[in-house]
Amino acid sequence: RIKLERTNSMEGLYQTQRIKDLKDKMLSEPRYASIEQALIITKTYQENEDDPKIIQRAKSLKAALEKMEIRVEPEELIVGNRTAGVRYGVVFPESGSTWVDKEFETLPTRPQDRFNVHQEDIETFRKVIKPYWEGKSLEDVLNQRYGKEINKIAKVVKINQKDHAQGHICPDCVKWLKMGPQGLLDQAEEKLKICKEEQKDFYESVKIVMEGAKHFMVRYHDLIMDMAENESDETRKQTMIKVAQNCKNISERPVQTFHEAVQSTW
């Protein structure tokens, strides 16, 4: 029998200079609400109005992965974020934007979870993004289905987290790591050859998203390699090249190392 001893000792746990530098950068950076993805997604939907909803969603995700600004800190060993700002918050109009519209001006001063907002972003949101999504967002669709009685109840209790996207908590990580985006893309192409007509949109959407995921990974590879060329510290330069190579590797094949697995899952 193994004897377990309870201890409060933190001996052996320490913070490296690299981690300290990353932490200091993150905590010192101002927080902003970003409409970058919202603009990309809105434009993509506008350009593909006749497509099935699942294809619209796939194309909008691919467009965001291909066009949104990316950034890497030299100290990072695992890269990737949904905005260039480390602590930025994303406005996602497809889920719903009523609360954002109501609270934009108070985001910098509210008691909790504050975000700065550029005035021009507020104006763009209200002129370009919000008008397009009125009546089309998930929030709007659910409000139509609930009826007046259910909406009254929702003022007291939480009825469906209609303003939250929960997909991030239920991915099939095992399949993702075993196949990678290229493997899933190949699988979708094979399925398209034999699937029923009503299944085609789904497999086509998988193809589109995996193409976007591969491109996103390669973008990070290219950015880090450019940064490495100007890095004077040889040790850090070699580390950056390794991180870049990980990004390229996982875009082309299943993961082969723990480092690649963590990067791919992130």
Each model region followed by its residue ranges:
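Structured, charged N-terminal subsegments at the starts of enzyme catalytic cores
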Residues: 178-266
